[in-house]
Amino acid sequence: MKVYITYGTADFLKTIVQKHPSENILLMQGQENAILIHETNGDTVFQAPHAYEVIDQVGEIKHPGFAVLNNIAVTQEGRPLFENRFKNRAGKVENEPGFEAIRVLRPLDSDTYVILTLWETESAFQDWQQSGSYKEAHKKRDTSAGIDTTSIFSRPSYVTTYFAVE
């Protein structure tokens, strides 16, 4: 399974969605731009996408109210360690109220992995961040047992968020 992501204005991206009604494409709006997320086993309909292979997934990409993309740049040497960490993750987020889906995305044309989580609402995501399962999932962060203390990261990670577009 592949995920393709492209960015632009909501009006322009909406025309792409309308041209391809049978494709599984999400249109979402962020603070600075809009995003299309296309999940498919085939080729993408985008002209210039960021391409990813799905290496872990739970739930369906449908019509969430809120999306969180954790962008994590990983060195070539660090990829096996990073992927192993996510393949052995606690899996707690799936049981949270308002959770809809997660995709761990391996980049095909860059060094930046994306951890995509989809939620019913922004408040559901914020509630998860205050929960025990969030603390459990991140308990090894900044410890010798975690991977944050190694040099597998190319640069600091960053998070982008998006809201559903009707």
Curated annotation (Swiss-Prot):
Subcellular location(s) of the protein: Cytoplasm
GO cellular component: cytoplasm
Positions bearing the site annotation: Transition state stabilizer: W128
One BP term from GO: heme catabolic process
Segments forming domain ABM: 66-153
Disruption phenotype: Neither hmoB single mutant nor the hmoA hmoB double mutant display robust and reproducible phenotypes relative to the wild-type.
Stored Gene3D superfamilies: 3.30.70.100
GO terms of molecular function: heme oxygenase (decyclizing) activity; metal ion binding
InterPro entries: ABM_dom, Dimeric_a/b-barrel, Heme-degrading_MO
Outcome of substituting N70A: Retains the ability to degrade haem, albeit at a reduced rate relative to the wild-type
Binding site for Fe cation: N33
Entry's induction text: Constitutively expressed.
Superkingdom: Bacteria
Signal peptide extent: none
UniProt keyword terms in alphabetical order: Cytoplasm, Heme, Iron, Metal-binding, Monooxygenase, Oxidoreductase
Biological function: Catalyzes the oxidative degradation of the heme macrocyclic porphyrin ring in the presence of a suitable electron donor such as ascorbate or NADPH--cytochrome P450 reductase, with subsequent release of free iron.
Record's subunit section: Homodimer.
Full protein name: Heme-degrading monooxygenase HmoB
Organism: Bacillus subtilis (strain 168)
Gene for this chain: hmoB
